[in-house]
Amino acid sequence: MSGRVLVLGLGVTGRAVMDALVRRDVEVLGVDDRPGVVARACAERLAVELVEAPAPGDWPRLVGRATEVVVAPGIPDGHPLFAAAEAAGVLVLDESDLAARWDDRPRC
């Protein structure tokens, strides 16, 4: 994975994804519509830029800063990120896609 990865949704899964990406030396942009204290502390600990509550019109610019996007569970299908990612041709993954990518076990 190269470039910057935008992680949307910084609950338990999103924070774990950010941590895993940072451990693999991937640049991360964390985004949450309503980040809590724990999400802010995690972003600070990982030295990840955190964007809080972006307006709907901000998504094309945010997605344009990323080479890929990882969405946490619970992000609704109608979230403006999806339209922005499609328009920009940016791949959207979830945590299981990311895990499969990193799984180096032999395949049958």
What are these regions (language model features)?
Residues 95-108:
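Walker A (P-loop) phosphate-binding motif
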